Amino acid sequence: MGCGHSRLSCCKPPKKRRQRPDQPPKPEPQELGPLNGDTATTDHVCASEEAEQHQKAITRILQQHEEDKKKWAQQVEKERELELGEKLNEQRKVLEGEHVEALRVLQASYEQDKEALTHSFQEAKAALQETIDRLTAQIEAFQAKMKRAEESILSRDYKKHIQEHGSLSQFWEQELESLHFVIEMKNERIHELDKRLILMETVKEKNLLLEEKITTLQQENEDLHARGRNQMVVSRQLSEDLLLAREALEKESQSRRQLQQEKEELLYRVLGADAAPAFPLASVTPTEVSFLAT
């Protein structure tokens, strides 16, 4: 590195020329002493320059190491955030499962209640309508029959009484008794009809309550569907955010691997060129030493 090439060229003594056998030996030059002094000075300068370059390289590596530590601390924080995001995502999935299960149970219960109430309502409505029709027909038939009976009895008895007695007093007494009996029968019939009407009103009130309950259940079902749709939207958004976070983590991991590879190459170039430098290394912490060793 640095002055390595110049050290080879300027720090070695000049080679001696080979003398021929027939030539007499030449005397050694008198300037050998100063030449050896210059060579030692040059070696010292080259060693100092090389030590300075090694020191700068190690300082640069340590600075890069500090930057890497900061980046890795940020990366650890990001990974913690991603881990927290994954835990939140798992909790969200569990809550979604519980929500879906509760919604399914509630929906099934709602459908069962709705079906039972609808069936009960239809049966009560049909029975009530049948009772109304039957009572109406009975009343109409009874009224027609009573009218015909009254007309027939009154006309026949009136004519017979006139033929037998020639007086109307006894006839009217009998007619009053007959009318009293008819009125009693009608009163009993009216009481029976009143009871049935009260029963019909009770059934009608129950049907109204059932209709209100069905309406309430339908509204709750619509609310549950709306909440389910909102939950699905939030779930999709969280899934998209998680996917983006994973992509960012993958890019950061690739960048870190590339940085690690560049660091190893730089350390190999710096430390592999001269395994035993002839200068004191700067003081480094145990963490930096372990980093350089890796």
From Swiss-Prot:
InterPro entries xref list: MTUS1/CCDC69 (IPR051293)
GO biological process: spindle midzone assembly
UniProt keyword annotations, A-Z: Coiled coil, Cytoplasm, Cytoskeleton, Lipoprotein, Myristate, Phosphoprotein
Coiled coil (residue ranges): 47-270
Subcellular location: Cytoplasm, Cytoskeleton, Spindle; Midbody
Principal location class: cytoplasm
Keyword Coiled coil found: yes
Basic and acidic residues: bias regions: 20-29
Chain positions covered by the region annotation Disordered: 1-43
Lipidation (N-myristoyl glycine): 2
GO cellular component terms attached to this protein's record: cytoplasm; midbody; nucleus; spindle midzone
Keyword Coiled coil appears in the UniProt entry: yes
Its biological purpose: May act as a scaffold to regulate the recruitment and assembly of spindle midzone components. Required for the localization of AURKB and PLK1 to the spindle midzone.
Stated family: Belongs to the CCDC69 family.
Protein name from the UniProt record: Coiled-coil domain-containing protein 69
UniProt gene name: CCDC69
